[in-house]
Amino acid sequence: MFNYNKDFFSGVYEKSDWIVSETFNRCIKFNNIKHFKEELIKTVNKSKENLKLSLLTSHPELTGKIEVKNLTKESLSEQKSAGLNKCSIEEFDKLHTMNNSYNKKFNFPFIIAVSGLNVAEIIKNFEIRIENTYDFELNEAIREVHKIASIRIDQKIKSLDRK
């Protein structure tokens, strides 16, 4: 049974609560969390490209030696869990260089669901994905955004279960 309101899901999409709001406005009832997540994906997929790009550009770069000032608490926690706050100088330099190259090529930041990954795995994904075409990478970045949102939803629900 789905007993949540839209405010509960604030922050699941990085600085893009319009997705949750629009999904709640479009759908009267959700059967369960899986159904809700599917409807969130539909909301993004049906949105115009400028909204999709806005969603992507609202995500922070993977910074290594995390620069806290512009990160949401969710992003800060996720990047710390992947060890980005403890990366070596070489890893930091590589991430910085790759961020610049990726942004130059695609005009949005590299996005990956970092939960469960380490710095080496993130860099490997970076190296693979920077070779993608724009259209492929746009869709890949959006898939990663949905993974991040799904993880955040699950964490919010688990936090309720612990109370």
Annotate the PLM regions.
Residues 18-19, 114:
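Conserved phosphate/anionic-ligand binding catalytic regions in large, soluble enzymes, centered on
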Residues 16-17, 110:
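Residue-level signal for inorganic ion chemistry
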Residues 91-160:
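C-terminal non-catalytic interaction appendages of large macromolecular assemblies
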Residues 1-4, 47-51, 133:
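Residues that cap or delimit alpha-helices
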Residues 9-11, 18, 24-98, 148-163:
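Aromatic-anchored, charged helix-turn/loop surface patch used as a conserved interaction hotspot
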Residues 1-14:
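Charged, compositionally biased N-terminal leader segments and the immediate start
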